[in-house]
Amino acid sequence: MTAPNIEMIASSLRNCSLNGGGGGGGGRRRGRRAAAAEGSDDSEGVTVELNSEVALPYHWEQCLDIRTGQVYYINWEDGTRTTIDPRSSSAYSPSPASRSASSSSRRCSRARGRGGGGGAAAAASTTTSSGYTSVSSVGAVTAAAAAWRSHDSSGHGYGYGSYGYGYGYDGRDGDDEESSSSSSSSSSSSSASSSRGSAVSSTLSSFSPTDESASGAGSGYAVGDNGAHVLVAAGCRACFMYFMVPKTADVCPKCGSSGLLHLSRNGYV
């Protein structure tokens, strides 16, 4: 039995193809390579100039249409779309003044919308024929902003002045609210005290001007000329309140009920 020829087997394996004969498979591969080379030849020489070394204005955006390969630009301030590069336009000069002008024009338009500083805002900005806004007076813009802030503080109050909390930019609203609340509380207290009437007046009648002046001196005692009146702490059984009353008083100065419990160091007296 003769041994197999290894070289013949190796050559047959090299020419073998799973898609058919060896020659046919190699031809198809060569055809695909040729088509790819032709496609690459067609795309060669097609370039798109992006001008990346010069920055676009901040409200412009550069876009590329994938289907047509065309570069276009969108102005997000007014929504316009154009194929003209705004950097190559003679009307545009890439300086900070144009950006400040646009921001100033937006502030002025907001001020006109709120009703404050309309004339100053109109004098503050001018529009050129190319559509860009330039600032003619910085002081006018400042005046418009001040008028806008004053309109907000007086008309809206940021949730303080208009609701009467007393903490807003205009403190008069809070003062009016406090005065109205104090007047209402005083009227209610006067009506309540008139109902108690005679009992409270009889209790307070025991004080004299000399007693009040002596107690205001901080001595703790309402001492008259003869030292007969002494202030003590007393508790009311009805309203559960403690008061400083004369030692001889037996009526609550708040509710008018009798039977005050006078307190001393050792307890009740």
UniProtKB/Swiss-Prot annotation:
Residues 87-106, 121-133, 180-202 have a biased composition (Low complexity). The keyword Cell wall biogenesis/degradation does not apply. InterPro entries: WW_dom_sf, WWC/KIBRA_Hippo_Reg. It comes from the Eukaryota. Residues 54-88 form the WW domain. A motif (EAR) lies at residues 47-52. Gene3D superfamilies: 2.20.70.10. One of its GO terms (molecular function) is hydrolase activity. Residues 203-212 have a biased composition (Polar residues). SUPFAM superfamilies: WW domain (SSF51045). Keywords: ATP-binding, Helicase, Hydrolase, Nucleotide-binding. Residues 17-44, 83-133, 174-218 are annotated as: Disordered. Binds to HDG1. Negatively regulates the cuticle development probably by interacting with the HD-ZIP IV transcription factor HDG1. This is Protein CURLY FLAG LEAF 1. It comes from Oryza sativa subsp. indica (Rice).
